[in-house]
Curated annotation (Swiss-Prot):
Bias type Polar residues, positions: 288-297
Protein known as: LIM domain-binding protein 1
Main function: Binds to the LIM domain of a wide variety of LIM domain-containing transcription factors. Acts as a coactivator together with otx2 to stimulate lhx1/lim1-mediated activation of the gsc promoter in the Spemann organizer. Acts synergistically with lhx1/lim1 and ssbp in axis formation.
Organism: Xenopus tropicalis
Record-level GO BP terms: positive regulation of DNA-templated transcription; positive regulation of transcription by RNA polymerase II
PTM characteristics: Undergoes rnf12-mediated ubiquitin-proteasome-dependent degradation.
Lineage of producing organism: Eukaryota, Metazoa, Chordata, Craniata, Vertebrata
Amino acid sequence: MLDRDVGPTPMYPPTYLEPGIGRHTPYGNQTDYRIFELNKRLQNWTEECDNLWWDAFTTEFFEDDAMLTITFCLEDGPKRYTIGRTLIPRYFRSIFEGGATELYYVLKHPKESFHNNFVSLDCDQCTMVTQHGKPMFTQVCVEGRLYLEFMFDDMMRIKTWHFSIRQHRELIPRSILAMHAQDPQMLDQLSKNITRCGLSNSTLNYLRLCVILEPMQELMSRHKTYSLSPRDCLKTCLFQKWQRMVAPPAEPARQAPNKRRKRKMSGGSTMSSGGGNTNNSNSKKKSPASTFALSSQDVMVVGEPTLMGGEFGDEDERLITRLENTQFDAANGIDDEDSFNNSPALGANSPWNSKPPSSQESKSENPTSQASQ
């Protein structure tokens, strides 16, 4: 008989007081200890264990949204089965219903990785060991890769269980072979495998049934919650699925294009550019203050640039502000001679009030001045 090798028994670390005391953050090697607890709980199985026992087992070690995946290869090709939290209890129960009396997992050189909210355990040399008592005492060793994801909290429950089976072996004690060495029929029966790829017919049939049961979990849950008929549950689920399919995908928020500020030409600059010729032609008739009127109509002030890190576009340009002087307009009162002459500051005898003599009067005065000479 082969010796059973379950590996070294995990020791309680100093920080662990006793089972049942909650802790907010798990200690080191907590994943190994959870596998040890799972094996210990499976060893407590008896034939009297009912559905409530298996549901309590699953609640203790699996999350509410846990997914269990089994992959293996049969004669007709590779198989992959994925079941949810509701069907996980029946999966472990089917192993014992298939004739197994004991179940445990042996992990060699597992690799533990910490992530944001979960801890992953990857073991490339995992062995699932089951012992069968019928029709003959047989130990089945299923070798494969086991990948687990534990939630990083005080409960450390499994969220993802993925077991990829590579090969299996069925071991029989030598004593049994010696007892039936003279019986050819018994030796022929002992030479046949009792499992397929390490799984019993009960487990394989249940996994095939899960292909139908897993999609129906939504219907069953809706039936229990709303007490609808199966036909109404199916119509509601199909309608919601159709809505999810035809609903347009949410467009990502588009960033508004940056609008560049257009610099508008001010009235003073327009006058200075468009009326430049007029200013040159009438420079003899107007006072020099008229040029000051064009340049002092408005004041262009350049603001400070924004700080580093601002958005490109509006904010990174210098802000140009137009300040209008409404109290003083140099153009008023320069070209209008009537308003200038009617000023109250000018008296009746003011020299500024006298008009220059006309050309005819100057001609009439010239002959008299020559005659007097």
